A protein has these predicted regions:
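Short, surface-exposed loop/turn segments at secondary-structure boundaries that line and modulate
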Residues: 307-315
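Long, low-complexity, mixed-charge
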Residues: 1-70
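Extracellular glycan-modifying ectodomains
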Residues: 302
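Conserved beta-strand/loop scaffold segments within soluble protein domains that form the structured core
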Residues: 49-290, 294-297, 313, 319-332
Length: 332
């Protein structure tokens, strides 16, 4: 118990002044100061088949069958909210976030204290005319498999940012379902693999209605004999004209023995659309490195400066927050 309390105190150090929070331990909410803005219920769930009929993956089925508890977090008012996960025992975590209509929400989800092998499923439903800034930070020390799905309704605006800094094998799946018209989606994903192991990312955007727009950018870094596999799929269904889909992947391979594999794909079944994708993977530009070293920096310091600039979009207007400072200290 003493050790758990120490971890919770450490987790609370990531919370800024006047920020609302929920702390989860092994998938259960154990502490919050957001009861005016948020309702937390156990073993009640949104039926997402009311919004989209699809086949669940084997991982989703496994988590549904084995998670001891399912938690629903219902956001009812405008809020700046941080959700922090502490986990050292539960193997399966299953929860949902339901954001009501016409809200302005800044939401941060932190997996920074998950030390065991965990399989996690998060489903997020954003009702119409809401503006959501959603930030994630992953720091798994055990082997982790994460499936996160967003279901966006009409006139939504979602700005999604994530940073992966895991020290073990990791499989991440992110699904963005644009279900109704006039949805604007911006995604920034930063993946850092220095674990010496293989990490996989499957990043999917589905345009399932006309007049939707998405822009997905991934910045990847591999070092220390690590492998990072990134698969992007952007899909526009038939009958969904006037969609705009963009995706881009950039990668820096820091050492000789690491590798980044990027596999972008567009599946377009409609003519009246705009869609583009691209991938650029390679070592640090030697001319830039040489220039910095000629100014008196060591090779290591030069590489560090280049990488910090490379991932800086994640920290825009965020580097001075408690979590921003924590992450920057971790990746130095």
């Amino acid at each position: 118990m003493k050790q758990l309390l120490e971890v919770i105190d450490s987790a609370k150090s990531l919370i800024d002044e006047n920020e609302k929070y929920i702390i989860f331990n092994d998938g259960k909410a154990i502490d919050t100061n957001a009861l005016d803005e948020v309702e937390i219920t156990l073993n009640e769930a949104i039926d997402f088949s009311d919004y989209l009929r699809k086949n669940d993956t084997d991982l989703e089925k496994l988590i549904d069958q084995n998670a001891k508890v399912k938690t629903l977090v219902s956001i009812k008012k405008d809020v700046d909210l941080k959700i922090i996960h502490v986990c050292d025992d539960a193997k399966y975590i299953n929860y949902q976030i339901d954001i009501a209509k016409r809200l302005n929400v800044n939401l941060t989800v932190v997996y920074g204290y998950v030390v065991n092998d965990a399989k996690i499923k998060l489903d997020v439903l954003i009702h119409h005319k809401s503006v959501v800034n959603f930030r994630e930070y992953h720091e798994f020390s055990g082997e982790a498999k994460i499936n996160t799905s967003f279901y966006l309704l009409r006139f939504n605006q979602l700005n999604y940012l994530s940073l992966e800094n895991n020290s073990n094998t990791n499989d991440l799946t992110l699904n963005m379902y644009l279900l109704q018209q006039d949805i604007s989606l911006s995604c920034l994903n930063v993946a850092i693999n220095e674990s010496g192991k293989i990490q996989n990312q499957n990043l999917n955007v589905y345009h399932l209605h006309e007049d939707t727009a998405s822009n997905f950018n991934t910045y990847a870094i591999a070092n220390n004999n690590s492998i990072l596999n990134i698969k992007n799929i952007g899909r526009i269904n038939n009958g969904c004209p006037r969609c705009d889909l963009k995706q881009k992947t950039k990668g820096i391979i820091v050492d000789t023995y690491s590798n980044i594999e990027a596999d972008p794909a567009l599946i377009i079944d409609e003519n009246d659309v705009m869609a583009s994708h691209g991938a650029s993977i390679g070592a640090i530009d030697p001319e830039v490195l040489y220039y910095l070293m000629s100014r008196g920096l060591t090779k290591e310091a030069s590489e560090k400066l280049i990488i910090e600039a490379y991932i800086s979009p994640y920290f825009k207007d965020y580097s001075e927050t408690n979590l921003g400072k924590y992450i920057l200290d971790k990746i130095k």
